Amino acid sequence: MKWLCSAAFVLLSPAAIADVCLLNINATDQMRFEQQTLQVEAQCTEVKVTLHNTGKLPANVMGHNWVLTKTADVAAVANAGMGVGLANNYQKPGDTRIVAATKIIGGGEDSSVQFSVAQLQTGTSYTYFCSAPGHYSTMKGRFVYNARSSIDIAQNGSK
């Protein structure tokens, strides 16, 4: 009986029923992301982003990563990361402005990061970018989190 109660608790706990939404994004040797917008819907409690570097060049020549911050923090986070080098994935260790980030990868490689949408603030603009030196000005896109489900919007009107 004790085992059955423990199993029921695990199966019914929020972590066990969390809806992980998967997003894929491609980066190229031409210093661009192929997707300009990534969108996450209200039913997602966790997001897993997988970055695919579709290029051919190695990480130390044309490496890319995927970094998510508030739009207002992009330049400051990118500039702070330049000074810490490739060994730190061009991300200042402990930078709390970074919501989520992958490691720097070279051509033909993949890297993933998973994070909770609880970190995101409704009504806040988010941007993803590559933090490799000189990349963030052209390698960026919008990250849209729809905190309200389509049912909420239909019942309460759009706001």
Residue ranges and their predicted role:
Residues 1-4:
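Positively charged n-region of N-terminal signal peptides that target proteins for export
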Residues 51-55:
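Asparagine-centered strand-capping/turn motif at beta-strand->loop junctions
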Residues 13-15:
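N-terminal signal peptide c-region/cleavage motif recognized by signal peptidases
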